[in-house]
Amino acid sequence: MATFTVNGQTVTVEKNQKLIRYLRDQLHLTSVKDGCSEGACGTCHVLIDGKPTKACIPQTDKLEGKTIVTVEGLTDWEKQVYTFAFGEAGAVQCGFCIPSMVISAKGLLDVNPDPTREEAAFAIRNNICRCTGYVKIIDGILLAAKIFREGKLPAPSADDWQMGSRVHRLDVEEKVLGYGQYPDDIYVDGMCYGGAVRSQYARARVLSIDTSEAEALPGVVCVATQKDIPGKVNVGHLKKDQPTLIGVGEITHYLGDSVALICAVDQETVEAAKKLVKVEYEVLPAIHSPAEAAAPGAPLVFEGDESNVQAYKHVSRGDAEGAIKSSKYVLTQHFSTPWTEHAFLEPECCVALPLDNGGVRLLTTDQSAHTTMHECAAMLGVDYDHCQVQNCLVGGGFGGKEDMSVQHHAALLCYLSRRSVKFKLSRQESILVHPKRHAFDMDFTMGCDENGIIQGVKASVVSDTGAFASLGGPVLERACTHAAGPYAYENFEIEGRAYYTNNPPAGAFRGFGVTQTCFCTETLLNEMADLVGISPWEIRYRNAIRPGGVLPNGQIVDESTGLVETLEAIKPAYDEAVKSGDPVGIACAMKNAGVGVGIPDWGRCKLIVEDDGKVHIYSGASCIGQGLGTVLVQVVVTNTGLHRDDIVYERSNTWIAPDSGDTSGSRQTLVTGEATRRACEKLKAELDSGKTLDALKGQEFYGEYLAKTDPLGADVPNPVSHVAYGYATQMCILDKETGRIKKMVAAHDVGKAVNPLSVEGQIEGGVVMSMGFALTEKYPIDENCKPTAKYGTLGLFRANQIPPEIQAIVVEKPGLNVAGGAIGIGEITSIPTAPAIADAYYRLTGEREFSLPLQNTPYAPKK
């Protein structure tokens, strides 16, 4: 027992427990986020006697007489300052880390009211952010310090909400102050908790499951096994190959497979009951790698399949082999890139509520409410009216929240028990369960003429897609179609294979396969420049695709093509670095916006004038931290002339908001932005006729947009693979004395920057994320197909480790005739970073590396 104060109130805690559990579960102080409960991520900082402390570490019995402050306990003035400063700086994206950042900032500013940039970065060194790259959070802390010193709030730099305005994100306040709801922040009277009993072996036949002892444990509400599933057993994003539960007689695919589900009155009882479920296995040989999967006579991950090949792609145009043979310079190299964990700050969580009609409503944190509805309704065997989905705030995704993780399990337990159920993954479960970035092995050959003009590229790639298909096929396809790079040449051939293994599944990850193959193409191009005797910048400028040119996939690019402009944007900094003798590396990239390759790609939006006389925006598109809600409000303001205060953005749901597809593929700004613009045209016509919003109450204005493209391999001279591409050039400059990165420059063609503040934040965040991919991040898997990393050992960059400068250059190239010319930027920001960094280190050391993460750098673990 201990007595202490929390936000000025004296409390006595009888039961010894972690402080975070008391603050969240008893006091419901939701600014204290539970990101890992391992003392690693830093989302749970509170002030204890003025010192920022992770609340997941101290036990309440050790806090006698202490003074604890959370964001809820800040003064009104402090809340105003941090909300304004973080909004003005663009510091907020998914928001899950932000209240803890505020606490760390307060801990600094209370003792140092005028910190340097380095001191601010050091103060948040124990707070991980996966979205922003820290630059704008540090900006926000320094701005807050300035406001506190001066004693008054300045006016915002922009408030007109037109497209192109640097307005504060619409969700800044609820994220800064911690009252915005993520699923784990929801507490319902009588709510139960769920958990999964997972396989002890990556590949084994389940011989029996005995749940009797677990069912008899006091506090257990129900235990579910496969026989309790009323509908279809399998779920899956594209291919339904992922069992909701493994049944008796079936073979497990990886250690994350579930064999039973527990529903109980509290999490402690769930954990106790899981240990009482008895499962008997026949252990079988596991497949650890694509090489093992491809070996003659290899066991099949899926019984009944002809082989372990999950996907095969072949992309060809012209005569690559002939062109390479006739080239003056030819380079061939083998490359490999590793598994990568998304490491979003918010672990997967879903709250399932029983509906009066016998169905369920799911409060989720995923990348498509409608996809969740489709999969869970089929599993429950109910129609869509009996399986409703509402998105809460989403604490980061990056592709890792496209698949089922907890939603179907929460839905099943709620459906069976008729009780509200919260189902949340522990951080270790999250690291095991959700799909990762594919590990790739790649062989590339490039031929150039004496002037450095690419003549042909031939390649083969192999990916480990793990236990399930997830999005392995589309990732492989995108890796292959983009492997040619953003250059104007004709002869290209690539063959790709994705193999099932018993490793954790791999699926969507920021860059969607292009990150891996771009590393190869750009590294060879840098090496080729040295052979030809020209600069890496010059070889790209000579080969760069220009408006009206033809990409290696045959698509004729339009006037919005801005690769040359990105190269020109970084040229002064590149020349200055070369002149000063600093080691500098460069790389380019392109990335599609939208699904493309002939797959129907719909954006949909509904504008409803509600009883409050305001226009409410409804779209099934998930806002996962990229700022989609702000974008759509800016689109409505621009295209209707309405004031910002007349517009309300509603989070996606499945019973009002029309399906607008997944938040994936850098697509939502373009496809849902255009759908919203079309809905605005209809509303604007009514307003122009003299009607007021009051007169339009109850009316709906619907817009949809279909991004039409041609299938891969379409028999047309110049297929349209994608409706739009973004282009980028990034540059890495090293400190030649220390060998550390002193500056990253990233120039990105975005068409129209709807909110330049958000665009810059996306660029900075993508750069830092792929600095980790290039230099430090690792996801080791042992001989039992078990990932061995914890959150704190993944190699994520921290605020005091980023370069002194990350320069984001926003290039706006007109020409795209949809969505006001805006092209999504979520993925491309992370694509060219690794090859640019690798080339910079070659310029420093004289040694090229063809595998990631790089080993010959100051960032590599000491051997």
Language-model segment annotations:
Residues 397-418, 422-423, 628, 634-635:
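Thiamine diphosphate
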Residues 226-227, 381-386, 416-421, 450, ...:
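C-terminal catalytic domains of large/alpha subunits in multi-subunit enzymes
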Residues 258-259, 264-266, 418-466, 673-695:
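Phosphate/diphosphate-binding loops
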Residues 1-156, 597:
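Signature of N-terminal electron-transfer/Fe-S-associated modules in redox systems
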Residues 295-380, 544-614, 695, 699-720, ...:
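Helix-loop-helix junctions that connect adjacent transmembrane helices in secondary transporters/permeases
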Residues 173-174, 275-288, 367, 374, ...:
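Extended active-site and interfacial segments that coordinate phosphate-rich ligands
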Residues 90, 165, 171-177, 307-350, ...:
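Glycine-rich loop/linker segments at domain edges
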Residues 145-308, 330, 416:
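Flexible, low-hydrophobicity surface segments
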